[in-house]
């Protein structure tokens, strides 16, 4: 029941954005939900992950990242979630005008703003990506360490495990 207080420990930022947020942020007049939903006969994780392309495109500005976190927390608050951990791959938002630290700081600010508005305590889990270079993933590890206890609570490894098995990431795990 909605009235029961809840904890949400596995929430993907890019997979939890509301249709309204995506339409407003991407300035869309319509949104075909099939573009962000995996088909019932999805054949692989790699195919499934293509559903995140559109939501990730909405996370390319500091304000959009902040507002995305607030959007996801708003939805959780409506379900009486009291604590949540939102995971996302910050390197997917790095671009010519947004570095890794600014991406994470924007998400942390979104957590703070959402707490002030909805009273849901939120931490972030930064995801290194299996298809990214070792250098990119080491930067994510360092950033997670920098923000640990200040909005970030953990590090994760995400992506297509079949194409990039765990053995490829031994050095990354040792660093973490």
Model-flagged regions — what are they?
Residues 1-176:
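Metal-cofactor-binding active-site regions of metalloenzymes
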């Amino acid at each position: 029941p909605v009235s029961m207080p809840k904890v949400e420990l596995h929430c993907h930022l890019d997979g939890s954005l509301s249709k309204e947020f995506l339409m407003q942020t991407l300035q869309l007049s319509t949104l075909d939900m099939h573009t962000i939903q995996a088909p019932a006969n999805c054949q692989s994780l790699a195919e499934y992950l293509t559903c995140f392309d559109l939501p990730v495109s909405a996370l390319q500005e500091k304000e959009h990242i902040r507002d995305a976190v607030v959007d996801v927390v708003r939805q959780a608050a409506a379900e009486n979630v009291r604590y949540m951990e939102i995971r996302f791959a910050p390197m997917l938002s790095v671009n010519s005008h947004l570095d890794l630290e600014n991406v994470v700081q924007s998400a942390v600010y979104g957590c703070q703003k959402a707490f002030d508005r909805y009273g849901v305590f939120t931490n972030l889990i930064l995801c290194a990506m299996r298809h990214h270079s070792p250098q990119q993933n080491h930067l994510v590890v360092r950033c997670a360490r920098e923000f640990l206890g200040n909005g970030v609570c953990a590090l994760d490894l995400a992506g297509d495990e079949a194409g990039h098995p765990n053995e490829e990431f031994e050095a990354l795990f040792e660093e973490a």
